[in-house]
Amino acid sequence: MEINQAAEKEQEYVHKVYNEIAPHFSQTRYKPWPIVTQFLKTRPMGSIGIDVGCGNGKYLGVNPDIYIIGSDRSDGLIECARGINPSYNLLVADGLNLPHKNETFDFAISIAVVHHWSTRERRVEVIRHVLSKLRQGGQALIYCWALEQGSSRRGYHEGMEQDVFVPWVLPKSKSKPKTKSTPPAKVKTRPKPNLMNIPPKERSEYLQRWKEEQQRSKSLDDNDEKQQQDQEQEREEVKYRYYHLYREGELAEDCRQAGAAVHSEGFERDNWWVVAQKR
């Protein structure tokens, strides 16, 4: 896949989607994972680091004794993070083009982010780019979705396709009213009766029956129109995000390919993780 094709794929199925689902996504991301928490809490006091793909910033306040700059490609998620805590150090930035000075930080984390790049070359490159911001010996904790998720509700397992599009279902909500007004449905009407052939004594009763039938017909049409509008307005909206599902050992291979030493690795919450150390 050419670079332009890969970037277009990521724009359509990653960047665009996260901006569209940002508020709902943020509501589901609030509890830090144990190993990430442990990594952050064991950084020496006064350490400075970066969270690449910080989302709503749930890891930025885990350890008050360290300093973290959070970045994300989604300005929608950065806005969510600012809403949660205005004191967070945040910026909008692509993980392949971070604005930080090289060899500046003591550590980095990138949680459930690298798997969104759509080729191996780009995934290795983003790991290399993150490492370039660390001082020699600095460590980066990287998490990616695992292929081996047989015990989870997602059901991914060894032998399945590794490059997948994962649905995100937005809750049912009233859709915005259509900008173009649609003409109201025509009420089915019966022609007004010709009273010329009706005996004078029966005309009043005959006309009253016609009015009642006309009203019943209008009520049925109004009800049908309302049901149709409700069905159009209340619907689930599904967005699809691109993921590369990492098989066991693959993330460590990518980190080594990026020039890092693998300090430690493991599995947590359907993710493979690696602590990559800059040589």
From Swiss-Prot:
Enzyme class: transferase
Chain spans, region Disordered: 172-236
Key words, A-Z: Cytoplasm, Methyltransferase, Nucleus, S-adenosyl-L-methionine, Transferase
Annotated compartments: Cytoplasm; Nucleus
GO (cellular component) term, any one: nucleus
MF-aspect GO terms: S-adenosylmethionine-dependent methyltransferase activity; tRNA (5-carboxymethyluridine(34)-5-O)-methyltransferase activity; tRNA (uridine) methyltransferase activity; tRNA binding; tRNA methyltransferase activity
GO biological process: regulation of translational elongation; tRNA methylation; tRNA modification; tRNA wobble uridine modification
EC nos: 2.1.1.229
Role: Required for the methylation of the wobble bases at position 34 in tRNA. Appears to have a role in stress-response.
Quaternary structure, from the entry: Interacts with TRM112.
Name the UniProt record assigns to this protein: tRNA (carboxymethyluridine(34)-5-O)-methyltransferase
The species this protein was found in: Saccharomyces cerevisiae (strain ATCC 204508 / S288c) (Baker's yeast)
